């Protein structure tokens, strides 16, 4: 087994905002994949919150009709919701999440140690999603 570092081809950092959740960001990511000759056996890895996961998952799902994808969510909300739901989406001028696909990640790595850096608001958002899911599940 080769060390992971030997297999890393490119790291792309972007500001995770609603503005960057766009076709432009997807195009940048996919151009990096093309430039580095990613094929269907290669894997795109997302490390970040929900926006990062959405953009990366959509990029993976539409690049060469789908490549492997691993999500490493760094927020509680992403760990309990968007990283495991299989819905990917980006925004356009008509609204949020109007372009997307259904694409389950090949793996999700949820490390609770990543949550230590979150502010109170981020933690509350995650707990609110947990509560919402619990209430909906118990109602059904």
PLM features: residue spans?
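Loop/helix-junction capping segments adjacent to catalytic residues or to phosphate/diphosphate-binding pockets
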Residues: 19-23, 53-54, 117
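A glycine/threonine-rich phosphate-anchoring loop and its flanking beta-alpha core
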Residues: 57-140
């Amino acid at each position: 087994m080769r060390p992971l570092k030997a297999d890393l081809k490119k790291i792309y950092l972007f500001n995770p905002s609603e503005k960057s959740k766009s076709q432009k960001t997807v195009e940048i990511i996919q151009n990096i994949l093309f430039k580095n000759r990613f094929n269907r056996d290669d894997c795109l890895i997302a490390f970040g919150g929900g926006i990062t996961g959405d953009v990366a998952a959509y990029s993976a799902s539409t690049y060469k009709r789908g490549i492997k994808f691993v999500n490493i969510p760094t927020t509680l909300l992403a760990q309990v919701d968007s990283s495991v739901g299989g819905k990917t989406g980006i925004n356009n001028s008509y609204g949020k999440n109007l372009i997307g696909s259904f694409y389950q990640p090949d793996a999700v790595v949820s490390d609770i140690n990543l949550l230590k850096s979150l502010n109170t608001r981020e933690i509350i958002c995650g707990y609110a999603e947990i509560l919402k899911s619990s209430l909906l599940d118990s109602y059904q």
